[in-house]
């Protein structure tokens, strides 16, 4: 597997996913700290979210993990407004939790995260070469569940996990590289398929 592969910009029909930078913390801090965004995130996210929370998270955890090759983090922007961050998505080698994301409230309900998740999943399989992706989500997180379903994933296990809102029953969804490629072939040109931005 080409785990040493550098992160690069991804493009979908409506989105640019650009590698996370420390400078993104300011925009993140403005749109991230809302209960509807954070409640189903892992309990390591502090709540109430501190005024320097995004900066410290990017400086102390996300960017070092990218430099080690343990994570691949992108800021999400609309092609129509490429300087404005609207969310983030990451890939990581953590057991049962290989992909995570959040999206600003103003952009919910438009299918944007489904598009971003498709692009990141393609990168996971086609460029990083992993054999399987697993994602965890609280049972009440129906929006995230729909994204896993639309990406062709299957429910494979149940467990309990700690979230910002407390300890909750959790679903584990998974898809193999072969299943992913079959899903993409059936989808016939899914709008989230990434294109190169070198």
Residue ranges with predicted function:
Residues 65-69:
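Soluble sensory domains of the PAS superfamily and closely related sensory modules
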Residues 1-40, 73-198:
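Acyl-donor (CoA/ACP) binding surface of acyl/acetyltransferases
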Residues 38-60, 72-74:
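Conserved GNAT-fold acetyl-CoA-binding loop/helix
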Residues 60-64, 123:
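A generic secondary-structure signal
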């Amino acid at each position: 597997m080409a785990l040493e592969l550098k992160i690069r910009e991804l493009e979908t029909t409506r989105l640019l996913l650009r590698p996370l930078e420390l400078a993104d913390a300011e925009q993140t801090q403005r749109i991230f700290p809302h209960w509807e965004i954070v409640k189903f995130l892992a309990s390591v996210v502090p709540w109430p979210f501190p005024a320097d929370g995004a900066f410290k998270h990017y400086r102390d955890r996300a960017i070092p993990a990218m430099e080690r090759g343990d994570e691949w983090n992108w800021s999400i922007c609309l092609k129509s407004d490429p300087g404005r961050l609207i969310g983030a998505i990451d890939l990581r080698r953590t057991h049962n939790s290989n992909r995570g994301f959040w999206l600003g409230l103003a952009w919910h309900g438009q299918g944007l995260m489904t598009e971003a998740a498709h692009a990141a999943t393609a990168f996971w399989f086609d460029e990083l070469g992993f054999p399987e992706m697993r994602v965890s989500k609280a049972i009440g997180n129906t929006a995230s569940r729909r994204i896993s379903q639309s990406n062709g994933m299957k429910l494979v296990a149940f467990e309990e996990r700690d979230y910002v809102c407390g300890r909750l029953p959790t679903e584990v969804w998974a898809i193999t590289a072969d299943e992913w490629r079959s899903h993409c072939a059936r989808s016939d040109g899914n709008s989230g398929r990434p294109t190169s931005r070198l």
